[in-house]
A protein has these predicted regions:
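C-terminal binding/interaction regions
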Residues: 1-27, 56, 82-149
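Structured beta-strand/loop patches that form or line metal/cofactor-binding pockets in enzymes
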Residues: 19, 23-59
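Functionally engaged cysteine thiol sites
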Residues: 40, 65, 127
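Active-site phosphate/pyrophosphate-handling residues
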Residues: 44, 73, 126
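Short, thiol/selenol-centered motifs that function as redox-active sites or metal-ligating centers
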Residues: 62-69
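Alpha-helical macromolecular-interaction surfaces
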Residues: 69-70, 89
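Alpha-helical support elements that line or immediately flank enzyme active sites
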Residues: 71-83
């Protein structure tokens, strides 16, 4: 990876962590769940409003590291407007990007590619995947808190 691309990815993560998109809660959400990463101290709530089988709105309320907040911000931007099945596919794809020995291809201009550097730091993978795991719990109506441990 070139230095310019690495710098761009770092800039994307910082942008999303400093001014996260879709931060907040949704009153009368169709799905909501809480997540916790005890090792890093990340805590997140994810809220989903559906219109039929489509995600009409998604928000998160997070207290955590830059990686966790940036991942949640990118996640909500990507998934609003998608069907539940598309969201499940995107969630699986993202988690595979960070955890699979043979990750799927990702375009350099895909904002999620900014989080690929996390692969080098196994403890930080949990920071990046926590929002996505919490989203899955929100969509499935799980009342159990998601935890990375």
């Amino acid at each position: 990876m070139s230095t310019d691309l690495r710098d761009l990815y770092q800039e994307i993560i910082l942008k999303h962590s400093r001014k996260p998109k879709n931060s907040g809660t949704i009153d009368n959400a169709d799905g909501e769940a809480n997540g916790n990463n005890p090792l890093c101290g990340d805590r997140i709530g994810v809220y989903v409003k559906l219109d039929g089988d489509r995600i009409a709105d998604a928000k998160f309320d997070a207290r955590g590291c830059a990686i966790s907040v940036a991942s949640a911000s990118m996640m909500t931007e990507l998934l609003i407007g998608k069907t539940i099945d598309e969201a499940k596919t995107e969630s699986s794809r993202f988690i595979d990007l960070l955890t699979s020995k043979d990750p799927p291809e990702v375009a350099d201009d895909d904002e999620l590619a900014a989080l690929l550097g996390v692969r080098q730091f196994p403890a930080r993978i949990k920071c990046a995947t926590l929002p996505w795991q919490t989203l899955a719990a929100a969509m499935y109506g799980s009342e159990t808190e998601v935890t990375t441990e």
